[in-house]
Amino acid sequence: SIMYDHLNAVDSDYIINYNPCQPFLNVDKLQKVINWFKASTHQSAITVKQERNFFWDNKKIPINFKPNDRLSTVSGPYLWVATHSLVMYKRSYMLENWELFPNLYNEPFPYLVDWDDKELIDVDTEVDFKLVKTVYNEIRN
């Protein structure tokens, strides 16, 4: 694929992917995280956010709450959800395994970088674009 051809040509041990579809990301914060990763010993990292909701596995078993619990979507248990704002990984691992990281704890599980939900409006559809336009106009005024 084009991505793997490109990775073969890149002269770097690590790759950082940036999601250009999130226009409200704080540039200074992005740079701070990139600088942290470059100085760290972690082999991979990914931006995430906390998602509070009711989640079940494919067998319809609750995964973040006990049956009959009274839960709130604003103050209950949460799961980490990837935002893909920044994805940082070892180039050789991607080329050898065709994945960013193995998703197994400490083999090497990616470091999770918690991101503020206010910056994470992701523009993938026309509706998303209209939402971003509205938020942008509110911020500007």
For the regions a language model picked out, list residue spans one by one.
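Short, well-ordered alpha-helices that flank and scaffold nucleotide-derived cofactor binding pockets
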Residues: N8, N35, T134-E138
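Conserved core of the sugar-phosphate nucleotidyltransferase
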Residues: S1-H6, Y14, P20-D116
